[in-house]
Amino acid sequence: MMFLFVSLFMFIFKWQRLIFILISLEFLMLSLFLKFSYLLSEMMFFYFMCFSVISSILGMVVMVGNMKFFGSDNCIF
């Protein structure tokens, strides 16, 4: 529940920077991962785990792509 709280507030109040959006989505994925680990069957848990890894990798690709092509990542300062 704490990860859900942190991710929602970070997503609401720090939406201007890409890195904070990606971090809040990772916290949201972690909260769902912890919640669904007790509720889902083994196969659905495996699908959800694969989805969370793929979304993490795609988030990093988006951030690196923005820094490469646009020059300013607009995420640190």
Swiss-Prot record:
Family of this protein: Belongs to the complex I subunit 4L family.
Lineage of origin: Eukaryota, Metazoa, Ecdysozoa, Nematoda, Chromadorea
TM annotation in the entry: 18-38, 44-64
Membrane topology, from the record: Multi-pass membrane protein
Keyword Transmembrane helix: yes
Cysteine pairings via disulfide bonds: none
Biological function: Core subunit of the mitochondrial membrane respiratory chain NADH dehydrogenase (Complex I) that is believed to belong to the minimal assembly required for catalysis. Complex I functions in the transfer of electrons from NADH to the respiratory chain. The immediate electron acceptor for the enzyme is believed to be ubiquinone.
Catalytic activity, reaction form: a ubiquinone + NADH + 5 H(+)(in) = a ubiquinol + NAD(+) + 4 H(+)(out)
Cellular localization per UniProt: Mitochondrion membrane
Name this polypeptide is given: NADH-ubiquinone oxidoreductase chain 4L
Source domain of life: Eukaryota
EC number: 7.1.1.2
